């Protein structure tokens, strides 16, 4: 599971195309969004989505889904990201493991869908607009903020990927019936906004990794305060620390899976006598 902005891509996804289209600087747009959120006591994610609609309307620019998807083509990624997913999936397959990749992001789903890496994801959980009959964005359809990101970890755990299906998500399910056990999960994010998911991984036996562009005390605190298992530069190239550690985690998962299966088979044999 991956965050997106500053985890896979090098900055906030709106910075590449959307904000320049408004003839604004990144600082101007995010200053307006942040001040709006603070003055109105708004969820910061809803504040930026409102700012996108407001700024577009004020400039008589339609905010169309297809335009946002098109903006995904200009998103820039950290080194190694583009071939990371196939490389890791192929590695897992050699060990008998089926590796799946998911995005859980507070960024825009439409922009992520337009990127060249979107085809690698089984599901993309991110913010999304509702559009009117003319195709203009009018309302937030999905808001993924820092704390409700954990909802999507549970969805992956149970295999309930439809965000409109809350009934099955909340239905009791035996642990051995859950599609992806927590112990078989890795969450990769870039900072404090990912802490709820990172701590959830550590609490339930999964793994969390913080990536960074420049090491500072904040990312080191995540490790020292046991909020993450590992910290690495955001370089996804082969044989980097990040690459080798993720592969080692998958090796461990494969061995644990074999031991679990052996335990299960022995119990079945005893019960079948």
Predicted regions and their residues:
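Alpha-helical substrate-recognition element adjacent to the catalytic core
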Residues: 1-133, 228
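C-terminal cap/substrate-recognition subdomain and adjoining C-terminal extension
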Residues: 73, 79-102, 106-273
